[in-house]
Amino acid sequence: MKEKVIIYQVLPRLFGNQNTTCKENGTIEENGCGKLNNFSDEVLASIHDMGFTHIWYTGVIRHATQTNYSSYGIPTQHAEVVKGKAGSPYAITDYYDIDPDLAVNVSMRMKEWEQLIERTHKAGMKVIMDFVPNHVARE
């Protein structure tokens, strides 16, 4: 008999964020941001132990933001077309990149994503990467 699929959906930019400021229109420095590395082996094991077979990571694709990552070769977006400082995780700017906010080391963001996939598989779960093809940034 096939195993029943039970999906745990999570928004990594909220998961593990210890900053409780929650300032409206705040910067990443003011409000903080969860990181891919917050999903440790222990955290993933506890999610698996609750009976989940898959983790649906939502909002990991690079999207419009007012945070300046130009030193990493990421173009800046005009503030008037970005939803808040953090931007919407559905305002995609590059379907082939990971949101730099989610990385401890921005230049290693893809490696951090690959390591999270490996940790998730090691914990006995499969990965679903949120992908909404008709949602893009305004520029």
Which positions does each model-derived feature cover?
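N-terminal structural segment of carbohydrate-active enzymes
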Residues: 1-126, 134-138
